[in-house]
């Protein structure tokens, strides 16, 4: 039996003492899921991590990833979670992946949107963010504004569109939620019912994406997104933070940055 000690865990990750299934084995992440849709992700060190995640050392993650067939049944044991011949122990160190809205938020400058990285649905980032916005993005932003104003919104119409484990529109909505929290337009009280009128989101998008979106509505975001908003107040760090954000997934980073830009424009009162 090989014992794995996580380096770090998110304090908002679900309680590991419940029944899990192996939901996906990837180069940088291993997903475990409950019947109710709770997600626990084992992340490879150096790849950032999400609000439902534990971070494993590179060598230990690679050994675990390479040693799994994909059909193992996770077992909860006294020390942690057993996966095949590996036991991932309960983490000892935790951190809070929740945004703290700054007193004086610094906006994302328009120049940072002049990037060639591809979004999932609207071409290069520079084109997707240019005026006039594509009609679909204008409608998406209008729907987000209505939701912030308290209008009951069924997000199933918008989610699940585009490629990826977290589809493009889902990432764009995550970016808009990040902007809303950053600028103080959402808080714990207003964020809690954000998806209340959306029924079962897993009917239209992936379970992984649903988990990230529900966390985002409550102000919990993956570490690269938090690094990005922190870096907006420190010009020396902004370029590196944006590069790290844009490196996420195939188009996830670009779609998220596009969403933040759309949310920022909305909250600054720009048409």
UniProtKB/Swiss-Prot annotation:
Whether Transferase counts among this entry's keywords is: yes
MF terms (GO), sorted A to Z: transferase activity
Task: List the Pfam families.
Answer: AllH
User: What is reported when this gene is inactivated?
Assistant: The deletion mutant cannot produce oxamate during anaerobic allantoin degradation. However, the levels of oxalate, produced via a glyoxylate shunt, significantly increase.
* Residue ranges that the Swiss-Prot or TrEMBL entry lists as coiled coil: none
Q: Which UniProt keywords apply?
A: Magnesium, Transferase
User: pH dependence, per the record?
Assistant: Optimum pH is 9.0. No enzyme activity is detected at pH 6.0 and 7.0. Activity increases in the pH range of 8.0-9.0.
Q: Which InterPro entries match?
A: AllH-like (IPR021530)
The main enzyme category here is transferase
Please list the reactions this protein catalyses.
oxamate + carbamoyl phosphate = N-carbamoyl-2-oxoglycine + phosphate
Part of which pathway?
Nitrogen metabolism; (S)-allantoin degradation
The annotated dependence of activity on temperature is: Optimum temperature is 30 degrees Celsius.
EC code: 2.1.3.5
So which cofactors does this thing need? Mg(2+)
What the protein does comes down to:
Component of a carbamoyltransferase involved in the anaerobic nitrogen utilization via the assimilation of allantoin. Catalyzes the conversion of oxalurate (N-carbamoyl-2-oxoglycine) to oxamate and carbamoyl phosphate.
Family to which the UniProt record says this protein belongs: Belongs to the AllH family.
Q: What else is known?
A: Oxalurate could not be used as a standard substance due to its unavailability, and the enzyme reaction was performed in the reverse direction: the synthesis of oxalurate from oxamate and carbamoyl phosphate.
Q: How does it assemble?
A: The OXTCase is composed of 3 subunits, AllF, AllG and AllH.
Record's protein name = Oxamate carbamoyltransferase subunit AllH
Could you tell me which species this protein originates from? Escherichia coli (strain K12)
């Amino acid at each position: 039996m090989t014992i794995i000690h996580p380096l770090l865990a998110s304090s908002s990750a679900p309680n590991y003492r419940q029944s899990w299934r192996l939901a996906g084995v990837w180069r940088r992440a291993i997903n475990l899921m409950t019947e109710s849709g709770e997600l626990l992700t084992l992340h490879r060190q150096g790849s950032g991590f999400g609000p439902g995640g534990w971070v494993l050392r590179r060598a230990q993650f690679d050994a675990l990833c390479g040693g799994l067939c994909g059909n193992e049944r996770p077992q909860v044991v006294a020390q942690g979670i057993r996966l095949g011949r590996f036991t991932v122990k309960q983490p000892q160190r935790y951190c809070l992946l929740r945004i703290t809205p700054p007193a004086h938020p610094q906006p994302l400058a328009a120049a940072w949107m002049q990037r060639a990285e591809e979004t999932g649905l609207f071409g290069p980032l520079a084109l997707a963010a240019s005026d006039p916005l594509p009609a679909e993005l204008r409608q998406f932003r209008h729907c987000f504004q209505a939701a912030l104003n308290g209008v009951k919104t069924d997000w199933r119409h918008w989610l699940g569109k585009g490629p990826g484990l977290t589809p493009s529109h889902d990432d764009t909505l995550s970016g808009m939620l990040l902007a809303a929290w950053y600028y103080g337009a959402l808080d714990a009280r207003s964020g809690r019912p954000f998806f209340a009128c959306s029924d079962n989101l897993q009917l239209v998008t992936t379970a992984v994406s649903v988990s990230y979106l529900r966390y985002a509505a409550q102000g919990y975001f993956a570490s690269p997104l938090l690094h990005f908003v922190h870096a907006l107040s420190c010009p020396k760090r902004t370029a590196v933070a944006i590069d790290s954000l844009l490196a996420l997934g195939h188009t996830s980073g670009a779609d998220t940055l596009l969403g933040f830009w759309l949310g920022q424009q909305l909250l600054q009162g720009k048409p």
